[in-house]
């Protein structure tokens, strides 16, 4: 019986140690990089697994199983120490940012997938001509519920326009529906927009679709259906969507990046502020310095998105780089990044922050040391809670 308990303890200890290793070591593959997101954001469960394994190992320690039990205890101790690191770092950042964390919500945190959200509506904002017919572009709209931050009914709400991630070639609106609903619960009207991810190269269409959505929202802002303040629109994007958000915000009236709406963008597509989660900002640098090619080949992603390399289409890489487009006229900017991002290096945040500082644009950065790329998709995780609170300010 003690031998079975010792083997079970080893199994639990090895599982905890393997999960903990993904917190501090580079992932060997893309699939394990996604597992690393959950490992870092749910590290308290690794801690629990390690504690159970250690207790079981001590219970099973007998002359014939002592070596196995000792090995299990050592693995559990190592996993415990590592599992505490992202938790402690999140507490430190929350304290620095004056964010009150909800630990009950943390224990209930889970992957943000689209579910039955009653407050959501879907509207078509563009009908684009394409071979064989037209292509409809839609946006999911989350209306303010007033659940957590009530506002007077007659007061126009602020709006958040969301551009999803997916390497410019995948993803869709609704990828972070719970986060969108959370912002709506806090008084925002949230528009989660669709943009074209194919065929590639699609740099012009994707950027133009985001601008088209902004123009549509501004045209309809004061209608009874929405009652939005058109001067208080925040553009928010994640990963590739963060790049598109920055580009649309920094070059609202650039003829090289026009709105894709058949009737034009209509109103000026400028926004009050822009928020970019773990976004590529210097595309030449990103092409030349992929973080981990076996996890995410940013060079190939950029080549397909733009239709060439920096050697063949260098001017276009610069036109599409937010670091090159930021001027004194750029809107207030919030840049958010995880320190352990294995898809988009944190250097992208640093380079854009330096440029914004140089041109005197109001900006803020939020770096969460042990957070991975896509950390906020663990809805309710500590890193996600910190980011939400900072965006809400």
Predicted regions and their residues:
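Catalytic histidine neighborhood in serine/cysteine hydrolases
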Residues: 357-374
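Primarily recognizes the serine-hydrolase "nucleophile elbow" in alpha/beta-hydrolase
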Residues: 212-289
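Catalytic nucleophile-loop/oxyanion-hole region of alpha/beta-hydrolase
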Residues: 42, 171-180, 191-232, 378-386
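Mobile cap/lid helix-loop segments that gate and shape the active-site cleft of serine hydrolases
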Residues: 26-34, 112, 128, 285-325
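Conserved alpha/beta-hydrolase "acid-adjacent" motif
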Residues: 342-351
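Short beta-strand/loop motif that positions the catalytic acidic residue
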Residues: 329, 335-337, 341
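Short beta-strand element of the alpha/beta-hydrolase
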Residues: 152-166
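N-terminal cap/lid segment of alpha/beta-hydrolase-fold proteins
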Residues: 22-48, 93-153
